[in-house]
Amino acid sequence: MMAFLEFSNISKGYPGVQALANVSFTVEKGAVHGLMGENGAGKSTLIRVLSGDQAADAGNILIDGEEQKYGSVRDAFHAGVIVIHQELQLVPELTVAENLWLGRFPAKGGVIHSKTLIETVRSKLEEIGIDIDPSAKVASLSIGARQMVEIAKAVMLDARVIALDEPTSSLSSRESEILFSLIDRLKAKGTVILYVSHRLDEIFRLCDSLTVLRDGKLAAHHPQIAETTREQIISEMVGREISNVWGWRERPLGGIRLEVNGLSGPRLRHPISFSVRQGEILGFFGLIGAGRSEMARLLYGADARHQGQVTIDGVAVSPNNPKAAINAGMVLCPEDRKFDGIVQGRSIEENIAISSRRHFSPFGILSPRQEAALADRFIAKLRVRTPSRKQDIINLSGGNQQKVILGRWLSEQGIKVLVIDEPTRGIDVGAKSEIYEILYELAAGGMAIVVISSELPEVMGISDRIMVMCQGRVAANVARPDFDERSILTAALPDKNAAGTL
């Protein structure tokens, strides 16, 4: 079969970084083609070039044998290329229907007929299999529902090439299954799907072929994904063998460092109690809506709590806001690192130093020399991959952004408790190992760590103990010797006769 999409010697550089170097591969018509690589490997840059968002320095893109000369996203759109990014491109203030038909509103005599628009979109969504109210404002939807709207938009536009960048990172299992069904239907129509993901299960389930990038270069191209293995792909991604991505090892545990009794709040109505010892990593697992992130926000003081007591090293603390929590020795790395974690538009240096300024000066002012020294120390310690501490943090990969957030809190004095929500979401397998190593080092130093994750293998891989949540309650408290994937998942599933302990 002839190639439908072809990348030929694509190169793209930025100051101090060669993001892509002579990348070439082809994709057949109607194929789902996987694109993998560590964060910073060049995947996002290649997608930006394909979408017309950025121009390549050299090389060509061909679609159905025709060389593409587009220089903008609009040009790429007219060529039949649609990219669905992790950062969604919807207008929150508009309805679902208005977003799906933006720029193409059905009108008569210059007047938009809202009823016609909503009914048209409702019919299209039903046809696709997406159950979302077309009259709902996008701002009222969950992140997962917004992702489904983006995907529906691409389907309705009859694109020839659709690139999906980590499409299931915010989807529930049910939403993911709907997406997979849509991909199968698009494939049958002859649409080319470029599927960017770190999830090997999805890659093997969906993809016909696969390209692996490493350090901006083509590390491997597999025309038939069935002829490769997970271990081979991981080795190609990282350039080395990773036999145990989790790297868990037993550590001596001290006394109780964090104790929580009867914690509840507006979105967590059932009181929760637990404790974490010095050097312990306590994992929280649950399905979407189980209350994990709500618990973290209450603990940190980001949301007001109804009741409950929190003690750190036996001293009662009242984290009614994040500042109070930090003063008590507790910090949070939030679930959505782009919007709640990093300070966009600021440098790596500024993001690391922002929480430490009060320790250097009563006026919260750091000299350029102090700020640079602090940033350099944590860039080296946490192995942040960047050409310069002055680089805008938004240009870093997800794994390196997470390291910078950790560096910010490690530079804060007197931190005893770290709460980290979805520590490796959207992060490649090599960077995951590095994040886990950082957590192990912190635990070995006596820090109490609470890890919240929707990925059960991750929670089981790195935790000393697991609290399973279901419908706002603790459904199980499992010690490491008793870890069993089936039992933990069963405890996490909603049940009228809920809960107990394993």
Swiss-Prot record:
<keyword id="KW-0997">Cell inner membrane</keyword>
<keyword id="KW-0547">Nucleotide-binding</keyword>
<keyword id="KW-0813">Transport</keyword>
<comment type="function">
    <text>Part of the ABC transporter complex AraFGH involved in arabinose import. Responsible for energy coupling to the transport system.</text>
</comment>
<protein>
    <recommendedName>
        <fullName>Arabinose import ATP-binding protein AraG</fullName>
        <ecNumber>7.5.2.12</ecNumber>
    </recommendedName>
</protein>
<dbReference type="GO" id="GO:0015612">
    <property type="term" value="F:ABC-type L-arabinose transporter activity"/>
</dbReference>
<dbReference type="InterPro" id="IPR003593">
    <property type="entry name" value="AAA+_ATPase"/>
</dbReference>
<keyword id="KW-1278">Translocase</keyword>
<dbReference type="GO" id="GO:0005886">
    <property type="term" value="C:plasma membrane"/>
</dbReference>
<feature type="binding site">
    <location>
        <begin position="37"/>
        <end position="44"/>
    </location>
    <ligand>
        <name>ATP</name>
    </ligand>
</feature>
<feature type="domain" description="ABC transporter 1">
    <location>
        <begin position="5"/>
        <end position="240"/>
    </location>
</feature>
<comment type="subunit">
    <text>The complex is composed of two ATP-binding proteins (AraG), two transmembrane proteins (AraH) and a solute-binding protein (AraF).</text>
</comment>
<dbReference type="InterPro" id="IPR027417">
    <property type="entry name" value="P-loop_NTPase"/>
</dbReference>
<keyword id="KW-0677">Repeat</keyword>
<dbReference type="InterPro" id="IPR003439">
    <property type="entry name" value="ABC_transporter-like_ATP-bd"/>
</dbReference>
<keyword id="KW-0067">ATP-binding</keyword>
<feature type="domain" description="ABC transporter 2">
    <location>
        <begin position="253"/>
        <end position="496"/>
    </location>
</feature>
<dbReference type="InterPro" id="IPR017871">
    <property type="entry name" value="ABC_transporter-like_CS"/>
</dbReference>
<keyword id="KW-0762">Sugar transport</keyword>
<keyword id="KW-1003">Cell membrane</keyword>
<dbReference type="InterPro" id="IPR050107">
    <property type="entry name" value="ABC_carbohydrate_import_ATPase"/>
</dbReference>
<dbReference type="Pfam" id="PF00005">
    <property type="entry name" value="ABC_tran"/>
</dbReference>
<dbReference type="GO" id="GO:0016887">
    <property type="term" value="F:ATP hydrolysis activity"/>
</dbReference>
<keyword id="KW-0472">Membrane</keyword>
<comment type="similarity">
    <text>Belongs to the ABC transporter superfamily. Arabinose importer (TC 3.A.1.2.2) family.</text>
</comment>
<dbReference type="GO" id="GO:0005524">
    <property type="term" value="F:ATP binding"/>
</dbReference>
